[in-house]
């Protein structure tokens, strides 16, 4: 993004950096802080909020960043930022009331907490860049509406699969081609992985076992592809997606899909297990223009009717700075939902569930997530994966059955349920 680094260098020369507030101090937040503070001119992390400030302190110390102040006092915090320091705080109101912070980055992966703090950020006039695909898939349309009502900006960031895919989708569409598949390349899939099975892997990478389980059991890819569908208006071919398996290169797999069916559907989101390049993303697109067809063949993309475009990786927090600059300086959100949902993620029993069982969170022992088309979700009264945590099962549910709202009692008084009621009416 050549135009972005030029804009950031100009900000640096004018001593007018974009001031970022970071929510959370996990692995992704750590990477973002490292990237912005060490390698991004024209941008600084002015504040980090974490419910336990000591964890944020450990992040700064591990990165060799020493110019910070730990405080919950708003006056001291504002002065520290004015003096060029970063602030670490465990008080959310102090964090949200900081004068100079203009954009907040939310990367917790939590639904209820994430929704609460994003809405509070909007109310305090802060723009929000989210790295929370789980929340955006579940409540993205209503969050975007709330942002517009508060005259602030909201978007998902680049670096994770939804943002990388949307960049590719726009690139392909900008050349006049018609995208018919937005796809994700997964290394493996096992719906029945749990925090117990993923404990060793999680520890080796410094992540929570639930996060590792979310990746392995298919829930994460479901949320990611739902975000893309909701930003493009695409659908899924069936509940759970087609999820073909192959060890071939993505360029050689267009034959797996029925072209006429793709055209009839108007485009789908998908994933392929085991293909190359992993962990990349791809767009299969078509064109009816004879001149384009001629030179796509000349460019070694084949004779169609499906042409393969791909990005061989997703670079996580390395792309965070460009995401922020695009949102703030260019009013160019990486990926935002359309006016309503098109694909949702529904809670599916990972094991037999019995009356009295309380459903644990995403990446837990009880459920995994599957994509389904929004109209089907609404007509069958299916339980959203993003709203399933804390629900109490009231009747037996067999393994691999999708839960409905008739199968559970929902906790009372949750903001996320009220937001869903609003979103359904959009």
Where are these regions (language model features)?
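N-terminal glycine-/serine-/threonine-rich beta1-alpha1-beta2 phosphate-ribose binding loop
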Residues: 1-120
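C-terminal catalytic/substrate-binding lobe primarily of soluble NAD(P)-dependent oxidoreductases
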Residues: 2-11, 201, 205-426
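Short, ordered loop/turn segments at secondary-structure junctions
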Residues: 25, 51, 93, 109-110, ...
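Short glycine/serine/threonine-rich phosphate/pyrophosphate-binding segments
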Residues: 28-32, 107-116, 131, 137-141, ...
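Short gly/pro/ser/thr-enriched loop/turn and capping motifs at secondary-structure boundaries
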Residues: 55, 135-144, 161-165, 186-190, ...
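Rossmann-fold NAD(P)-binding glycine/threonine-rich loop
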Residues: 112-124, 132-152, 158-159
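Rossmann-like NAD(P)H-binding beta-loop-alpha module
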Residues: 147-151, 155-220
């Amino acid at each position: 993004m050549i135009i972005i680094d030029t804009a950031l260098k100009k900000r640096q020369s004018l001593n007018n950096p974009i001031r970022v507030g970071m929510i959370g101090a996990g692995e992704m937040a750590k990477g973002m802080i490292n990237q912005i503070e060490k390698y991004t001119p024209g941008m600084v992390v002015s504040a980090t909020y974490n419910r336990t400030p000591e964890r944020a302190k450990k992040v700064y110390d591990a990165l060799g960043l020493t110019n910070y102040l730990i405080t919950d006092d708003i006056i001291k915090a504002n002065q520290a930022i004015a003096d060029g320091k970063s602030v670490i705080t465990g008080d959310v109101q102090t964090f949200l009331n900081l004068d100079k912070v203009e954009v907040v980055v939310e990367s917790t992966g939590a639904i209820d907490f994430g929704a609460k703090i994003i809405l509070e950020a909007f109310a305090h006039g802060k723009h929000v860049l989210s790295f929370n695909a789980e929340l955006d898939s579940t409540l993205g349309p209503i969050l975007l509406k709330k942002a517009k009502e508060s005259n602030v900006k909201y978007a998902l960031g680049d670096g994770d699969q939804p943002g990388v895919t949307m960049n590719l989708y726009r690139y392909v569409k900008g050349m006049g081609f018609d995208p018919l598949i937005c796809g994700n390349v997964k290394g493996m899939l096992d719906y029945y992985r749990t925090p117990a099975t993923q404990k060793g892997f999680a520890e080796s990478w410094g992540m929570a076992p639930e996060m590792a389980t979310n990746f392995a059991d298919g829930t994460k890819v479901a949320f990611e592809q739902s975000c893309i569908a909701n930003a493009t208006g695409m659908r899924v071919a069936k509940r759970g997606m087609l999820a073909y398996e192959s060890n071939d290169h993505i360029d050689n797999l267009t034959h797996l899909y029925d072209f006429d069916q793709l055209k009839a559907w108007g485009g789908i989101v998908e994933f392929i297990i085991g293909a190359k390049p992993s962990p990349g993303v791809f767009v299969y697109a078509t064109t009816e223009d004879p001149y384009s067809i001629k030179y796509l063949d000349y460019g070694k993309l084949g004779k169609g009717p499906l042409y393969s475009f791909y990005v061989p990786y997703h670079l996580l927090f390395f792309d965070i700075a460009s995401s922020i600059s695009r949102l703030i300086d260019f009013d160019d959100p990486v990926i935002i939902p359309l006016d309503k949902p098109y694909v949702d993620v529904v809670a599916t029993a990972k094991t037999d569930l019995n009356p009295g069982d309380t459903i644990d969170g995403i990446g837990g022992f009880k459920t995994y997530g599957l994509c389904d088309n929004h109209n089907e979700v609404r007509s069958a009264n299916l339980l959203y994966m993003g709203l399933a945590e804390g629900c109490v099962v009231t009747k037996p549910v067999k393994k691999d059955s999708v839960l409905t709202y008739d199968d559970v009692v929902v906790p009372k008084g949750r903001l996320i349920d009220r937001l869903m009621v609003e979103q359904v009416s959009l």
